[in-house]
């Protein structure tokens, strides 16, 4: 999945949603 899938656009984390 794209980085945006993690937590909002501009997010550079993976789609695991570590935020």
UniProtKB/Swiss-Prot annotation:
One GO biological process term is:
defense response to fungus
Which UniProt keyword terms apply here? Antimicrobial, Fungicide, Plant defense
The protein's job, in short, is:
May possess antifungal activity against B.cinerea.
- Name this polypeptide is given: Putative antimicrobial peptide 2
Name the species this protein comes from: Lippia sidoides (Pepper-rosmarin)
* Taxon lineage: Eukaryota, Viridiplantae, Streptophyta, Embryophyta, Tracheophyta
């Amino acid at each position: 999945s794209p980085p945006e899938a993690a937590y909002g656009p501009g997010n550079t984390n993976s789609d695991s949603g570590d935020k």
